[in-house]
Amino acid sequence: MSENYTPRLKTRYREEIREKLNGEFSYENVMQIPGVTKVVVNMGVGDAARDSKLINGAIEDLTKITGQKPQIRTAKKAIANFKLREGMPIGARVTLRGDRMWEFLDRLLTVALPRIRDFRGLNDKQFDGHGNYTFGLSEQSMFYEIDVDKIDRPRGMNITVVTTATNDDEGRALLRELGFPFKQKGSAE
């Protein structure tokens, strides 16, 4: 990325969304206006305990999707019933901050989520009480960086959007303004 390039979602947040949120919640200080701190993309690969090559596919997919090399997550303790030993790789995680985070959110909202078959919106009850939002995707094929013909197996992932909001209402308002497609209250499940 060049020096003077700013992601369009970041520009929209700075120029429009902050003013709307300030008008809606009337903050005393501009630093109280909620913003997005980081986005964590986690891909659990429980089968990697039996076949260690499976983690490589998850790492490859996450690298393509996020543009950043994932951190391999290992088992913290052994569980005999799952044939799991301490230190075995069981997942991969990427933490996105700054411009990469804004680019990922933009691609997620404008390209990936609309490509999901029978997508009716995200559940708006999955906030943690502090304005952070977590949702899961069942497979990786909706990202255009992934070649559908080369997918060895469908892999789901959890995406957590960490915000500076103090409660769920502020977080929900921020994400709705950013363009997160939440389900409408009146629609049937």
Swiss-Prot record:
Any one of the GO BP annotations: translation
Pfam families linked: Ribosomal_L5 (PF00281), Ribosomal_L5_C (PF00673)
InterPro entries membership: Ribosomal_uL5 (IPR002132), Ribosomal_uL5_bac-type (IPR020930), Ribosomal_uL5_C (IPR031309), Ribosomal_uL5_dom_sf (IPR022803), Ribosomal_uL5_N (IPR031310)
Alphabetic keyword roster: Ribonucleoprotein, Ribosomal protein, RNA-binding, rRNA-binding, tRNA-binding
GO cellular component, one term: ribosome
Gene Ontology MF, one: structural constituent of ribosome
Role summary: This is one of the proteins that bind and probably mediate the attachment of the 5S RNA into the large ribosomal subunit, where it forms part of the central protuberance. In the 70S ribosome it contacts protein S13 of the 30S subunit (bridge B1b), connecting the 2 subunits; this bridge is implicated in subunit movement. Contacts the P site tRNA; the 5S rRNA and some of its associated proteins might help stabilize positioning of ribosome-bound tRNAs.
Family: Belongs to the universal ribosomal protein uL5 family.
Oligomeric form and interacting partners: Part of the 50S ribosomal subunit; part of the 5S rRNA/L5/L18/L25 subcomplex. Contacts the 5S rRNA and the P site tRNA. Forms a bridge to the 30S subunit in the 70S ribosome.
Alphabetized PANTHER family for the sequence: 60S RIBOSOMAL PROTEIN L11-RELATED
NCBIfam families for this protein: PRK00010.1
Official protein name in the record: Large ribosomal subunit protein uL5
Protein species of origin: Corynebacterium jeikeium (strain K411)
Gene, per the UniProt record: rplE
